[in-house]
């Protein structure tokens, strides 16, 4: 490799440390990052495949602005998977609170929803099924997103009973492409930018 001085291979070098004065500076640095992140497909259709994303491709669907500030996200996905990374970046770039609920029990999840006033949950239908049966409503939750698996009207109805103030949608995505489109119930809309990719 042309840029590598062979005499410096395996030699310890100090890292250049960048100090940030504010979290806004950290977010700005992230948005300008040229770093790559390697993740693997689920293996649903065969052997898991390695997929390399840039920070830019992972954050392209992040929505920022005043209306996204002050949200409290339940972090219900594995942080090394596409959906986990997308939830992380959505929360991080808006300086939102992330509450880890991954692999917790139903009782622990409900306790954290109440304790932190969780406003947004993005998880698989299996995660939401694990919240059943329920004993009370949780009105702090404003938005529910399902992804990763097929769902049904019975589950939507149950979620609405648990989180009566929440809007519910279903996201369709892939590890290779990230979030593609979202549905409310059984009807989904394909964004204009990618409609020509579907028949």
List where the protein language model places each region.
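Carrier-protein-dependent adenylate-forming modules in NRPS/ANL systems
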Residues: 1-26
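Conserved pre-ATP/AMP-binding loop-to-beta segment of ANL
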Residues: 17-40, 68-73
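Conserved AMP-binding A3 loop
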Residues: 36-63
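Alpha-helix/helix-capping structural signal
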Residues: 56, 126, 149-150
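Conserved AMP-binding/adenylation subdomain of ANL enzymes
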Residues: 59-72, 80-120
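Conserved AMP-binding
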Residues: 76-81, 126
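Gly/Ser/Thr-rich phosphate-binding loop
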Residues: 120, 132-189
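Conserved beta-loop-beta connector loops within the AMP-binding
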Residues: 197-199
């Amino acid at each position: 490799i042309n840029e590598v001085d062979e005499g410096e291979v395996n030699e310890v070098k100090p890292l250049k440390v960048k100090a940030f004065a504010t979290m806004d500076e950290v977010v700005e640095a992230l948005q300008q990052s040229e770093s790559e992140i390697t993740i693997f497909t689920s293996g649903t259709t065969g052997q898991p495949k390695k997929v390399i994303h840039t920070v830019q491709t992972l954050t392209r669907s992040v929505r920022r602005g005043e209306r996204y500030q002050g949200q409290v996200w339940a972090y219900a996905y594995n942080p090394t998977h596409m959906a986990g990374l997308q939830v992380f970046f959505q929360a991080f770039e808006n300086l939102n609170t992330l509450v880890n609920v991954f692999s917790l029990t139903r009782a622990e999840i409900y306790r954290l929803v109440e304790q932190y006033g969780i406003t947004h949950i993005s998880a698989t239908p299996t995660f939401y099924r694990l919240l059943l049966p329920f004993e009370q409503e949780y009105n702090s939750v404003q938005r529910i997103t399902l992804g990763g698996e097929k769902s049904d009207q019975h589950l939507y109805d149950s979620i609405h009973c648990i989180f009566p103030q929440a809007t519910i949608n279903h996201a369709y995505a892939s590890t290779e492409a990230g979030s593609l489109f979202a549905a409310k119930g059984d009807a989904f809309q394909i964004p204009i930018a990618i409609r020509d990719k579907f028949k």
